[in-house]
Design a protein with these regions (language model features):
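Conserved acidic segment of CheY-like receiver
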Residues: 3-14, 19-23, 52
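Short acidic, S/G/P-rich loop/turn micro-motifs used as interaction or catalytic elements
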Residues: 12-16, 57-61, 90, 110-111
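A short, hydrophobic beta-strand element within the central beta-sheet of small alpha/beta folds
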Residues: 79-90
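Alpha-helical interaction/dimerization surfaces of two-component signaling modules
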Residues: 22-26, 43, 95, 99
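Acidic, metal-coordinating helix/loop segments flanking the phosphotransfer/catalytic sites
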Residues: 35-51, 57
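C-terminal output helix
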Residues: 109-119
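Short amphipathic alpha-helix used as the core "switch/output" element in two-component signaling
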Residues: 63-79
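Alpha4 helix (beta4-alpha4-beta5 surface) of REC/receiver domains from two-component response regulators
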Residues: 64-67, 88-105, 109
Length: 123
């Protein structure tokens, strides 16, 4: 089986590190960071990913993760890639799903069995 790839978008370094560590240790996944929407879109158009994890508010520039998800799902080439919002806020999760994301998880539940089961579908 080939290594599954995840694009982590808009996370601060500490959160990206926690997410990447969990995905590597649990699934053997490769995790690539993108700080901005433009960087993430460029990578998505040039590389193959099995999952995209998007922060609710991008650490680098304050961009909206919901807007990014909306943009990805409006792009014919990208909409087939599963996208999840990383947020502890239920209302943000509901908005993300409404614009095309898969049900996501919060950083507070990163290591919980339910989150691991959710991610297992894609990784």
């Amino acid at each position: 089986m080939s290594t599954r790839r995840t694009l982590s978008v808009g996370q601060c370094m500490a959160d990206h590190g926690r997410i990447a560590h969990m995905l590597r240790s649990t699934f053997g996944a490769e995790v690539v960071a993108a700080d901005t929407a433009d960087e993430a879109l460029e990578r998505l158009h040039q590389e193959s990913f099995d999952l995209v994890l998007v922060n609710r508010v991008f650490d680098r520039d304050g961009d909206s993760g919901i807007d990014f998800i909306r943009h990805v799902n409006a792009d014919e080439q990208l909409r087939k890639v599963p996208v999840m919002l990383v947020s502890n806020y239920e209302d943000a999760q509901a908005r993300a799903v409404a614009v095309g994301a898969q049900p996501g998880f919060g950083k507070a539940t990163l290591d919980e069995p339910e989150t691991i089961d959710l991610l297992r579908t894609y990784l």
